[in-house]
A protein has these predicted regions:
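Post-His helix in hydrolase/transferase enzymes
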Residues: 211-225
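Short, solvent-exposed loop/turn elements at domain surfaces
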Residues: 3, 182-183, 210-211
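Short alpha-helix in the alpha/beta-hydrolase fold that links the catalytic acid
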Residues: 50, 183-190
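Conserved serine/cysteine hydrolase catalytic core
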Residues: 6, 10, 15, 25-27, ...
Length: 245
């Protein structure tokens, strides 16, 4: 009963590979599995449209992970993510996965990759409105420990500034000039000399609209496709701005 609000995690994510969604015949047959990670006080339903978009364009393994906001430590959420990735790899026969994370979900994915050895399993991380440098949101929201970990002065954010030599995972950070929960808005960009990261600016997309906007979904599909066969290159790059309002 509490699961739909995100207060309790699911015991087992649904088998989204069996979704009643028509797949296109030729595209994406070799794509790694995609894991979708929602944001704070949300649940996997935030990714209904994106999951459908990926399946329709040929992705075969798309799984949305529910986790509980009662989890008070992002590090524990990252551990849970690691266990789920191992389960997905075992079930699908793939050796690596791609991750799309909205807000807190993106920060959890990045922490797993950078600080817990997840680069060995994660090919690509796409983040949507994720506070990579921390966000100065309303102080009242900081009553929750995991929200405090998303503030600029938190130990988690400081850990993510540490060197990450040899990290092979490719990052795409989508950030919007209209993201009301990212303060300042460019905190959703990745700035790290050791990471192979590309920042993708958007115009006119609010925080909650990022995982459901059709044009953003197209950009995510393109990012996941571009990552195939790409050679690891450290350093941050900037994409041209895109208006999707």
């Amino acid at each position: 009963m509490l699961y739909p609000s995100g207060v309790l995690a699911e015991a087992k994510p649904p088998d989204t590979e069996q979704a009643d969604t028509k797949q296109l015949p030729t595209e994406g047959r070799s794509h790694p599995p995609v894991l979708l990670l929602h944001g704070f006080i949300d649940n996997r339903s935030a990714f209904v449209l994106l999951r459908r978009s990926l399946l329709r364009h040929g992705w075969r393994h798309v799984t949305a992970l529910n986790y509980s906001p009662l989890t008070c430590d992002l590090r524990r959420a990252a551990e849970q993510l690691g266990r789920h990735i191992e389960e997905v790899c075992t079930r699908t026969g793939h050796r690596e996965v791609d991750i799309v994370g909205h807000s807190l979900g993106g920060l959890t994915a990045r922490y797993y990759v950078q600080r817990m050895g997840g680069a060995a399993r994660v090919r690509t991380v796409v983040t949507l409105g994720t506070p990579h440098s921390g966000t100065r949101i309303a102080p009242a929201l900081s009553a929750h420990p995991i929200v405090r970990q998303m503030r600029p002065d938190s130990d988690v954010i400081k850990e993510l500034t540490l060197p990450a030599p040899g990290c092979r995972t490719r990052f795409f950070a989508f950030w919007s000039d209209l993201d009301e929960l990212m303060v300042p808005v460019d905190t959703a960009r990745i700035e790290h000399q050791d990471l192979n990261a590309q920042n993708v600016p958007l115009k006119g997309v609010g925080h909650l609209a990022l995982p459901v906007h059709g044009a953003v979904a197209a950009g995510i599909r393109q990012a996941l496709t571009d990552a195939e066969g790409a050679q690891p290159t450290a350093g941050t790059r900037e994409s041209g701005g895109a208006s999707v309002a």
